[in-house]
């Protein structure tokens, strides 16, 4: 187990610098430097299984860590942490490993090891003219962390990142290595499961329970993703009438309003997001409206996400100022709204990878999301605005993002 390195008790801090604590043991997991991809993957699986077996035998706690986007100190209660960001193998399975009932192109399948970052997977796919089906607001999460914690997606009619998953390789203990997929849509066959030394389980309920499970089912070692041909997203980021925003946030009836996107008249957006300043809620909100277009033969990366057009460090920016000037939340956000919110964009086109890209967060920032039914959106927003008005200011901005309901049992996006 030279690939598993025990660093002993260590201070651990999350990416947003909002949580810090002492772990009982910081464990660094890595793959072998020699051998085929499959050999490396299986050797690491054996290491992880042995590590879990020892932990269970000694009745200790252990949990994997991905991109350090955790927001809770629960992980530090006498718990060992496995850092997985070196576990980045990925490959496309062969046709012989695919279930014969799977009629789609097997080249639209990607098997990714748990520590692979969304960004690296997107680059890998981009080089093959492929794309993830959806993304969160940025790309710093590991694939296992993103799905098991229910990271939101970006597509109105698709869903979250975890909704593109068609199989999970979960290690529970020594000699307990499973590949779980839906019985109603089995994508891989016994040959694939055997190649990663796993027992194949076809079970819809088990799959939906394990998909968003915060690691409670075991160590998610590998994730089978269904991807698609790359596509462009045409971006309109503009202020829209408050009355139109109120209609859309409860109905998504785009034909009932007049959006500033004349070239896309009659088309349903791929993505719709509203940005609201809670200290000036009667102002026309900023809307980010994206339309899906076929991918090009050749692609030249635009400057769409440069600081000049979209301030990717908005949360960190707010945090730095308000930390140094307590009580300045309302004043700062109102004065600097034009710098905090994205600038107007008109018909700029980019791949999914370049549209939802890097986010740099500095300072002790906190971001959270709650899932609500579509028809309760305006009511929920009104409650949040009243809370801020009644109980003091919070250095925050609100973003409303609309995604399809997920079948994952613990997904926060469980409402229609």
How would you describe each model-predicted region?
Residues 1-416:
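Noncatalytic alpha-helical scaffold of FAD-dependent oxidoreductases
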């Amino acid at each position: 187990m030279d690939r598993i390195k025990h660093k002993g008790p260590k201070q651990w801090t999350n990416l947003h610098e909002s949580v810090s604590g002492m772990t009982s043991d910081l464990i660094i997991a890595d793959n072998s430097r020699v051998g085929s991809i499959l050999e490396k993957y299986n050797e690491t699986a054996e290491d992880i299984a042995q590590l879990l077996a020892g932990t269970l035998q000694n009745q200790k706690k252990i949990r994997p860590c991905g991109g350090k986007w955790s927001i809770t100190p629960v992980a530090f209660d006498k718990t060992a942490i496995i850092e997985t960001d070196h576990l980045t193998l990925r490959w496309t399975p062969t046709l012989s490993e695919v279930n014969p009932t799977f009629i789609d192109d097997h080249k639209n399948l990607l098997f990714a090891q748990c520590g692979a970052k969304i960004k690296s997977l997107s680059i890998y796919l981009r080089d093959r003219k492929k794309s993830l089906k959806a993304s969160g607001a940025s790309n710093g999460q590991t694939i296992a962390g993103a799905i098991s914690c229910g990271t939101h997606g970006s597509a109105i009619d698709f869903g979250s990142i975890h909704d593109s998953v068609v199989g999970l390789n979960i290690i529970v203990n020594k000699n307990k290595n499973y590949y779980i997929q839906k019985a109603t849509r089995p994508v891989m066959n016994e040959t694939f499961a055997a190649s990663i030394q796993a027992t194949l389980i076809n079970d819809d309920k088990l799959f939906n329970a394990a998909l968003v499970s915060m690691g409670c089912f075991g160590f998610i070692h590998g994730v089978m993703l269904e991807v698609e041909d790359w596509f462009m997203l045409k971006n309109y980021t503009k202020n829209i009438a408050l009355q139109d925003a109120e209609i859309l946030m409860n109905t998504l009836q785009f034909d009932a309003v007049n959006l500033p996107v004349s070239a896309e008249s009659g088309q349903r957006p791929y993505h719709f997001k509203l940005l609201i300043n809670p200290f000036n809620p009667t102002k026309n909100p900023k809307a980010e409206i994206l339309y899906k277009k076929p991918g090009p033969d050749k692609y030249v990366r635009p400057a769409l996400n440069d600081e000049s057009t979209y301030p990717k460090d908005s949360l960190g920016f707010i945090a730095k100022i308000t930390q140094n000037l307590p009580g300045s939340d309302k004043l700062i956000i109102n004065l600097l709204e034009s710098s905090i919110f994205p600038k107007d964009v008109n018909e700029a086109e980019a791949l999914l990878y370049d549209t939802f890209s890097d986010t740099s967060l500095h300072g002790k920032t906190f971001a959270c999301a709650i899932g609500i039914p579509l028809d309760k959106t305006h009511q929920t927003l009104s409650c949040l605005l009243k809370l801020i008005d009644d109980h003091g200011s919070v250095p925050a901005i609100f973003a409303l993002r609309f995604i399809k309901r997920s079948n994952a049992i613990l997904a926060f996006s469980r409402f229609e």
